[in-house]
Regions:
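C-terminal transmembrane helical hairpin of 12-TM major facilitator-type secondary transporters
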Residues: 274-317
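Helix-breaking motifs and short loop linkers at transmembrane-helix boundaries and internal kinks
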Residues: 47, 79, 100-106, 134, ...
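Juxtamembrane intracellular "pre-TM" segments in multi-pass secondary transporters
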Residues: 2-12, 190-216
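Helix-loop-helix hairpin linking two adjacent transmembrane segments in secondary transporters
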Residues: 135, 142-186
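A late C-terminal transmembrane helix in Major Facilitator Superfamily
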Residues: 324-360
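Cytoplasmic helix-loop-helix junction between adjacent transmembrane helices
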Residues: 110-150
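Conserved MFS/SLC helix-loop-helix module at the cytosolic interface between two early adjacent transmembrane helices
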Residues: 65-102
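Helix-to-loop junctions at the C-terminal end of transmembrane segments
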Residues: 68-79, 259-272, 355
Length: 407
C-alpha cells in the first residue's frame, strides 16, 4: 500500500501537539540550508575568506556527527518531550548568538552549538509525531516528510529574504521562529513514554560491525562529500545576490523533496534499490563535472538539477541503512549517520582549500570522483547490501527516529 494513499485522508486531522512538532520541524530543517544564500555576504561582512565561512557547515555537521552517539542515549533517559525542548533551547540560544557575531570564529562556534540543538530536536521529532498522531504511522510519516521537504526548500528562501537586508537577520529570524516552536511544544505536547530499553553510547558503533551497514555507511560517506560540496561551495562559485542565490537553492530544495518523497520509491519498485542508487550516483558525478566546467547558466541549471539526484540518493541510502542489518532502526541509523556526517563536515573545509591549491574547477572534479567511489562501493559490496535491500518493500526514508538528516 502506498503510504500516501493510506495517510491522505487523515493527515490534516491531527492534534495540536502534532502540528506544533511538525511546525518546529520545518524551521529545524530550514536551518540546514539557511546560510547558503548569505555565505558571500557573511564573508564580506566579517572580512573572511570562503574557506573560513564554509566552516559554518563544518562545525555544524561535525557536531551533528558526534551527536548521533548521544541523541538516543539522551532521549531514552529523559523522554521525547524534554529532548525536543532541550534541542529547541540550544537552537534559540545559539542561532540568536550567531546573529551577534563580530568574528567568523564566533559565528562558527555558535553554529556548532546550533548543530547540537538541531540534532537533539530533529532526531526525536519523528518518533514524537508518530506517537501523538491520529490516523496511524502512515499519516504521521507523510506529515513529517512534508515538513522536511518544506523546510529544505524554504531555508534558502528565508535566508535570501532576510539576508538581503543583513546577513545577521536570518539567524535572528530562526531564533524567533524556534522560540515560538518551544512555546507551542511546551503548551501542547504531553510527555511521551520512554523506551523499554535505554540506548548506550556505544550501541551505534557496535552496529557498524555488520558488513552491510558498514558498506552503506562508507558509500554514503563518499556521496555526502559530493552533496556538501554542492551545498556549501557552489554559492561562492555562483557569486549571486542573496535573492538570486536563494531562488536557485529553493528550486534545488523543491527537486530534492519531490524526488525523495515521490519519485525515489517508485523507481525502487521498478528497478531495485541498488540499481537506482548506482545510476543516480553516476548521474550526480556527471552533473557536478558540468557544474564545475560549464558557464554560469550551466552551473545554475546543474546546481538545481543536483537536487533530484540528491533526493533519490538520500531515500535509498537511508532505507539501506535501516534494512540491511538486524540492529534496531534508531541504533543502525545512528551508526550510519555517525560515519557519513563526517564527510558533510569535511567537504565545506576542503573544497575551498582545493580551490586555493589548484583552481575553481578541481573541487568539482574531486566531488565527481567521490560520487563515483560511492557507486564503486555499492557495486563491490552489492552482495552484502543485497541480502535484504532488494527484498525490501520501499518505505519512506524518514521512518525512523534518527534518520531525519538523511533527507
Amino acid at each position: 500500500m502506498d503510504p500516501f494513499d493510506a495517510g491522505a485522508g487523515s493527515i490534516l486531522r491531527q492534534p495540536k501537539a502534532v502540528w506544533a512538532t511538525a511546525g518546529a520541524s520545518v524551521v529545524a530543517f530550514m536551518g540546514i540550508g539557511l546560510v547558503d544564500p548569505i555565505l558571500p555576504s557573511i564573508a564580506k561582512g566579517l572580512d573572511a575568506s570562503a574557506g573560513q565561512v564554509s566552516l559554518l557547515f563544518t562545525s555544524y555537521f561535525l557536531i551533528t556527527a558526534l551527536a548521533m552517539l548521544v541523541t538516543g542515549f539522551v532521549s531514552s533517559r529523559i523522554g521525547g518531550r524534554k529532548t525536543l525542548l532541550l534541542g529547541l533551547a540550544f537552537v534559540v540560544v545559539f542561532a540568536g548568538l550567531a546573529g551577534t557575531s563580530d568574528t567568523v570564529g564566533q559565528l562558527v562556534g555558535y553554529r556548532a552549538g546550533w548543530g547540537l540543538g538541531n540534532a537533539l530536536f530533529v532526531s526525536t521529532a519523528l518518533a514524537v509525531i508518530v506517537g501523538a498522531a491520529a490516523g496511524g504511522s502512515a499519516a504521521a510519516i507523510l506529515l513529517y516528510e512534508s515538513a522536511l521537504g518544506l523546510g529544505m526548500a524554504c531555508g534558502p528562501l528565508l535566508g535570501a529574504l532576510l539576508g538581503d537586508a543583513s546577513w545577521r537577520y536570518p539567524f535572528f529570524g530562526t531564533a524567533f521562529l524556534m522560540a515560538i516552536g518551544f512555546l507551542c511544544i511546551t503548551v501542547f505536547l504531553k510527555e511521551q513514554p520512554k523506551p523499554a530499553r535505554k540506548t548506550s553510547l556505544l550501541d551505534p558503533i557496535r552496529a557498524l560491525g555488520h558488513g552491510g551497514l558498514a558498506s552503506a555507511a562508507v558509500s554514503a560517506f563518499f556521496y555526502n562529500y559530493t552533496f556538501f560540496t554542492v551545498l556549501a561551495f557552489t554559492p561562492f562559485v555562483l557569486n549571486m545576490t542573496p535573492y538570486k542565490s536563494g531562488a536557485v537553492f529553493f528550486a534545488w530544495g523543491v527537486l530534492l523533496a519531490v524526488f525523495s518523497v515521490l519519485v525515489a520509491p517508485r523507481m525502487q519498485r521498478r528497478f531495485g534499490s541498488l540499481k537506482v542508487l548506482g545510476g543516480s550516483l553516476v548521474l550526480l558525478a556527471a552533473d557536478v563535472l558540468v557544474l564545475g566546467y560549464g558557464n554560469h547558466t550551466a552551473a545554475i541549471v546543474c546546481t538545481i538539477l543536483s537536487g533530484a539526484f540528491i533526493g533519490v540518493n538520500n531515500t535509498v541510502y537511508t532505507e539501506l541503512a535501516l534494512g540491511v542489518s538486524d540492529a534496531p532502526r534508531p541504533v543502525a541509523s545512528a551508526g550510519y549517520n555517525f560515519v557519513r556526517w563526517f564527510a558533510a563536515a569535511a567537504a565545506p573545509y576542503f573544497a575551498p582549500k582545493i580551490e586555493e591549491w589548484t583552481d575553481v574547477h578541481i573541487p568539482f572534479v574531486v566531488a565527481a570522483v567521490t560520487a563515483l567511489l560511492g557507486a564503486v562501493v555499492v557495486l563491490v559490496r552489492r552482495r552484502a547490501l543485497t541480502a535484504d535491500a532488494e527484498e525490501l518493500e520501499p518505505k519512506h526514508a524518514s521512518e525512523d527516529s534518527v534518520t531525519v538528516f538523511a533527507n
